[in-house]
Amino acid sequence: MTLEEARRRVNELRDLIRYHNYLYYVLDAPEISDAEYDRLLRELKELEERFPELKSPDSPTEQVGARPLEATFRPVRHPTRMYSLDNAFSLDEVRAFEERIERALGRKGPFLYTVERKVDGLSVNLYYEEGILVFGATRGDGETGEEVTQNLLTIPTIPRRLTGVPDRLEVRGEVYMPIEAFLRLNQELEEAGERIFKNPRNAAAGSLRQKDPRVTARRGLRATFYALGLGLEETGLKSQHDLLLWLRERGFPVEHGFTRALGAEGVEEVYQAWLKERRKLPFEADGVVVKLDDLALWRELGYTARTPRFALAYKFPAEEKETRLLSVAFQVGRTGRITPVGVLEPVFIEGSEVSRVTLHNESFIEELDVRIGDWVLVHKAGGVIPEVLRVLKERRTGEEKPIIWPENCPECGHALIKEGKVHRCPNPLCPAKRFEAIRHYASRKAMDIQGLGEKLIEKLLEKGLVRDVADLYRLKKEDLVNLERMGEKSAENLLRQIEESKGRGLERLLYALGLPGVGEVLARNLALRFGHMDRLLEAGLEDLLEVEGVGELTARAILNTLKDPEFRDLVRRLKEAGVEMEAKEREGEALKGLTFVITGELSRPREEVKALLRRLGAKVTDSVSRKTSFLVVGENPGSKLEKARALGVPTLSEEELYRLIEERTGKDPRALTA
């Protein structure tokens, strides 16, 4: 073996061992046996002994033991200061910013700016030495932050190793939680009666500060990077636009929409366009960041004690409104959980009137100290769900009244039970629980029983014709024709719809049954993982945690439901009625046995491509490993591409993927839907 061949193999082995260390020590999800791991480590040691010039202090052979599993959050000093940004809230303030630049530089504008979306997350700093990640830390006070390296490494797009960079380098960015992950996490926490997060930014901060990195890994955090600290001069970069491209080329995720704009008026055009698109984004964006594009001008302008003189945050208008909490209603969900709902003086927020707002659970009410009659500040969490941000206690008059939880179910009168901070109606005959369960089961995204509306469900329950969803399949024509406004034709149509619903498949059935924390996406993932209801009923906690999108709280809640005798009896009766318990066969199983990972931007939405691959029998994962069959590479790929090359994983362009699908199915993949 030549020195060059040894160098390539040593680098490959180090990457492999680091990757498996990460799986074992951080995610607690090893992919190889201890014996296979030992074989890799032994081969690396032998090569380093045979070629001592290849030894390196960062080699896994030089590290004593493993990284600690618990994050420590020790204070760490940033090599160079992290500054804040001045804010602007109007075009006039952006013009004033440009005028300050003109005066400082002694020349007239307009100047060229790079404009980037301002992702609302938590600022972090990554520090590399000789291309190796030494630590990652939060911004803190700008001088000193908290080390969160272990938790940052659970974000798969953060590179551990770089090539073609200065010896000492700081990379700055934002860690954030996508809106979908935020809503899912809050649903889990609410179901458990735990404290929920007010917004995705708080959720990201709380998730990054988990002591157990495995918890962080399940929270779905993402990162985007946009700046360099130490090492910027050594790169020789001339513009912010080029800096973003430079970061992307080295495997860092960079928010894809950045652009250039000329002068304050050009910035305003971009701002207005992005403001309209704000709610279409998968993450919270609270404005745009405006930076002089020419880095030489940065050096001329410098910094104040707190902020750079060459950059500005142009904030989107706050969609927060003040209103009064008039009363609180208590609703009974299909699982019996009691949810307090605040009745508000109507207020207009983000295009719609808001008159009701969830107060989640007892923990939320206690933490907020909200009372009937209070003035409250309301917004839409994730741009979707109306929520109380805070109580305006300075406006209290003394006439406000505390919120008193009922002792009995507001629907059936049965005594409520308390599980932690969750109030629940245990009555299996509670009409509200039955109504909500049947309504959800029949809904379009569940079993899609057209014609079974709310009024008809109420009549069926009132007449004692159904008690639960399994009874729907025992209905006969003579049961229905005597109901008000239900003729013979309508009865026949409804019975046909009920019969057709038997064949919807496991995915729709799981969503329809309302397992805790299980929405459409999770129902699909469970169906793909287990394939049949019988296998799901036998699943354990670890089996559920292997399913994409399932965190520990959701896994335990699902498991409790699966083991519940009433639920198992319901499933038995549905099976006897002929309801399909198996996942629907995926078209031709054309890609069965193949595992795909996707990186970069595709011409179709990524989730759509993932769903298509799964429908064709493939497995889709988020991280590259030796088990990956193909890495699909779109525009502006991330660090997964480098890892795939290190592991020898084949890559496909989007077009090559579609050609593969066409070869396997004989159909144009663009005509196939997920």
Swiss-Prot record:
The active site is at residue 118. Keywords: DNA damage, DNA repair, DNA replication, Ligase, Magnesium, Manganese, Metal-binding, NAD, Zinc. Its cofactor is Mg(2+); Mn(2+). It catalyses: NAD(+) + (deoxyribonucleotide)n-3'-hydroxyl + 5'-phospho-(deoxyribonucleotide)m = (deoxyribonucleotide)n+m + AMP + beta-nicotinamide D-nucleotide. PROSITE patterns: BRCT, DNA_LIGASE_N1, DNA_LIGASE_N2. CDD domains: BRCT_DNA_ligase_like (cd17748), LIGANc (cd00114). This is DNA ligase. The gene is ligA.
